[in-house]
Amino acid sequence: MIFKILCSLLLVTSNFASALYVNETTSYTPYTKTLTPTYSVSPQETTLTYSDETTTFYITSTFYSTYWFTTSQSAAIISTPTASTPTASTPSLTTSTNEYTTTYSDTDTTYTSTLTSTYIITLSTESANEKAEQISTSVTEIASTVTESGSTYTSTLTSTLLVTVYNSQASNTIATSTAGDAASNVDALEKLVSAEHQSQMIQTTSADEQYCSASTKYVTVTAAAVTEVVTTTAEPVVKYVTITADASNVTGSANNGTHI
């Protein structure tokens, strides 16, 4: 009798344990992300010829070069006030040249890639008694040079940047006299204060053109070549969970008079 009870309880408990505890498998898929270039140099193809008395051989090789560029910050304009007001056109010139050289080599050949950027900034100032207009023209040349076994390949990109800065009209000095009525003196004083205030503040028109006081402008533009490749990979992870129940841990009892 007791043996039957124990067998029944063991079967019920085994079914319950099998339904409650199962193997669990968790898998993670690898994730890869690669940044794409914003500018790529066209491939350079080289053909070598070798011939003997009966046969001519052609060997063609292609060299690929890719550059990554990041967006440069906006050009910083540093204003340095002049001691005296210019009365004629006062041009100034700023030139900045940056050169970046990268060397590629294999067992037989060495490739040298040179990236040169030149920025030419020209400023011209008109008479300060008028609304002087300062024009800055930047001619940018980006030359990529690849040298291979005595042959040189050059690719040049040219872009022109036009920067326009407007100067406000210089204030005219209005002198006040002690003679005359008080109303005219107050009116002249208000005009003087208003003119000085207009010459010192920055005005913005409806076309978002900025006005500022007469000064010498220095514009510096810099650029740097940056190569970035980002790869993130997660390895798959497999997890197994197994729980077993031992029959010796199952106990049972039956009351007298119970028949199973």
From Swiss-Prot:
Q: Does the keyword Transcription regulation apply?
A: no
Superkingdom field = Eukaryota
Would the keyword Signal turn up in this protein's UniProt record? yes
Instruction: Recite the other comments.
Output: Present with 688 molecules/cell in log phase SD medium.
Functionally, this protein is described as follows: Required for vanadate resistance.
Q: Where is the signal peptide?
A: 1-19
Keywords (alphabetical) are: Glycoprotein, Signal
Q: Which organism is it from?
A: Saccharomyces cerevisiae (strain ATCC 204508 / S288c)
Q: What's the protein called, per UniProt? A: Protein SVS1
One of the record's GO cellular component terms? fungal-type vacuole
Which residues get glycosylated?
N23, N249, N256
